[in-house]
């Protein structure tokens, strides 16, 4: 670990269209090979499509989707006396947001729609309605933590 301590968190700039730091994080998560304008086009297109389909505020739909995808518990491997236990731990807020965005974008890429814009739009709408693969991933994570509750005393 560095002697100076952990590096300070850099402030997140809100995106110019919606003024939301969450949209900026989503753009950065969609980003591939440094092509920021392409990532922005995909995210803004998905949010506009979500506005057209749901008829509401797309940022509100994104926030609702994030709330439905954010995990509150996860399991971490802990080695004790030659055995490896899956120990349930609470997820810090920053990590839960990062995981939720990673899952949303990852499962968007795995969908069957033609363009990434459509895939992301539909995954956001599904997640805001409590459906979709990203929400299922959160439920699986919570189920795993619940089934390993017996090892919670190994927490660190």
From Swiss-Prot:
SUPFAM superfamilies in the record: Ribosomal protein S7 (SSF47973)
InterPro entries associated with the record: Ribosomal_uS7 (IPR000235), Ribosomal_uS7_bac/org-type (IPR005717), Ribosomal_uS7_CS (IPR020606), Ribosomal_uS7_dom (IPR023798), Ribosomal_uS7_dom_sf (IPR036823)
Keywords annotated in UniProt: Ribonucleoprotein, Ribosomal protein, RNA-binding, rRNA-binding, tRNA-binding
Originating organism: Paenarthrobacter aurescens (strain TC1)
Family designation: Belongs to the universal ribosomal protein uS7 family.
Gene Ontology terms describing biological process: translation
NCBIfam families per record: rpsG_bact (TIGR01029)
Record protein name field: Small ribosomal subunit protein uS7
């Amino acid at each position: 670990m560095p002697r100076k301590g952990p590096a300070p968190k850099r402030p997140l700039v809100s995106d110019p269209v919606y003024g939301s730091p969450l949209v900026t994080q989503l753009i950065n998560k969609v980003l591939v090979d440094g092509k920021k304008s392409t990532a922005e086009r995909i995210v803004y297109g998905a949010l506009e499509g979500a506005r057209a389909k749901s008829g509401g505020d797309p940022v509100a739909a994104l926030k609702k989707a994030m709330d439905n995808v954010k995990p509150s518990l996860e399991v971490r491997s802990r080695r004790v006396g030659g055995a490896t236990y899956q120990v349930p731990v609470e997820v810090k807020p920053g990590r839960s947001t990062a995981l939720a965005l990673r899952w949303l974008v990852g499962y968007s890429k795995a969908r069957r729609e033609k363009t990434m814009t459509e895939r992301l739009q539909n995954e956001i709408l599904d997640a805001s309605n409590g459906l979709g693969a990203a929400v299922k991933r959160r439920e699986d994570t919570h189920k795993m933590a619940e089934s390993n509750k017996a090892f919670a005393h190994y927490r660190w």
